[in-house]
Amino acid sequence: MAKVNLYISNDAYEKINAIIEKRRQEGAREKDVSFSATASMLLELGLRVHEAQMERKESAFNQTEFNKLLLECVVKTQSSVAKILGIESLSPHVSGNSKFEYANMVEDIREKVSSEMERFFPKNDDE
């Protein structure tokens, strides 16, 4: 283990001591929560955060690509469900039941979607 001498601000020093005190109050032994061990743990944690940030910069999230992929999946799902509803409405098991006629199923879905959308995106009086 390498030994390093460094200077830190009084604020950082007080915060590290506060962490040590809190751990001791929680029952940690004196030798388990030394200033050196706590400062080392915080330094390692800071390095991991720094590395994660650098990694994120290299492989930045592409919102446009995500939106495109999401829209593609939604359109595929919508198209598939429309075909399945069409097939289901022709089934002899549901013939004569207006609840399962294609036009009625579509209207029912639109009403339910509209209701859910209103919950999350209430309409303004201006619209």
UniProtKB/Swiss-Prot annotation:
Coiled coil: 63-89
Subcellular location: Cytoplasm
Effect ascribed to mutating R110E: 33,000-fold decrease in conjugation efficiency, but tetramerize and bind DNA normally
Domain of life: Bacteria
Record annotation: effect of changing K99E: 100,000-fold decrease in conjugation efficiency, but tetramerizes and binds DNA normally. Binds less well to TraD. May be dominant over wild-type
Family matches, as SUPFAM superfamilies: IHF-like DNA-binding proteins (SSF47729), TraM-like (SSF140581)
GO terms for MF: DNA binding
CC per GO annotation: cytoplasm
Induction description: Regulates its own expression from two promoters, requires TraY as well as expression of the tra operon for maximal transcription. TraM is in a monocistonic operon.
Keywords, alphabetical: Coiled coil, Conjugation, Cytoplasm, DNA-binding, Plasmid, Repressor, Transcription, Transcription regulation
Phenotype upon loss of function: Loss of conjugative DNA transfer.
Main location per the UniProt record: cytoplasm
Family of this protein: Belongs to the relaxosome TraM family.
Biological function: Conjugative DNA transfer (CDT) is the unidirectional transfer of ssDNA plasmid from a donor to a recipient cell. It is the central mechanism by which antibiotic resistance and virulence factors are propagated in bacterial populations. Part of the relaxosome, which facilitates a site- and strand-specific cut in the origin of transfer by TraI, at the nic site. Cooperatively binds 3 regions in the F plasmid oriT locus; 2 are required for autoregulation while the other is required for plasmid transfer. Bends oriT DNA less than 50 degrees. Plasmid specificity is conferred by the TraD-TraM pair.
Quaternary context: Homotetramer. 2 homotetramers cooperatively bind to DNA although they do not contact each other; cooperativity is achieved by DNA kinking and unwinding. Part of the relaxosome, a complex composed of plasmid encoded TraI, TraM, TraY and host-encoded IHF which binds to the F plasmid origin of transfer (oriT) in a site- and sequence-specific manner. Interacts with TraD. Also interacts with TraY.
Stated name of the protein: Relaxosome protein TraM
Organism expressing this protein natively: Escherichia coli (strain K12)
